[in-house]
Amino acid sequence: MYSYIRGVLTEKNEDGVVVDCHGLGFDLQMGPQLAARLGEIGTELTVYTHFHITQDSQKLYAFPDKESRKLFRMLISVSGIGPKVAMSVLEDFEPAEFALHVLKKDTKALTKVKGLGKKSAEQIGRAHV
């Protein structure tokens, strides 16, 4: 639906950020570690997005780069991993670092992510490596 949003960072909160794009404020889901990479309030920026629809909600997730969005999409394609766990992965690891742990089958490092158990970590390796 939306590939990216370019605008001005107007707010950071516990759930994400708000980006003003020509007078329209987009409420974007993003963890605090990722949000910190965006800069200060008032910064002009581009964020890459993923629109996620469930039976109960519609949320627009934002990422500072395409690689983070790609990892998020890969993770939510794995059975049992939802957006919350995928965002936790992105809070704890850079995409390249996470990929290295998956390639090494380093489940000890992967299971340090909140909500990611051994079974899910192994499933990621089987599904996408």
Predicted segments, located by residue:
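Structure-specific DNA junction-binding interface
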Residues: 1-77
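Conserved small/polar residues in nucleotide/adenosyl-binding loops
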Residues: 127-129
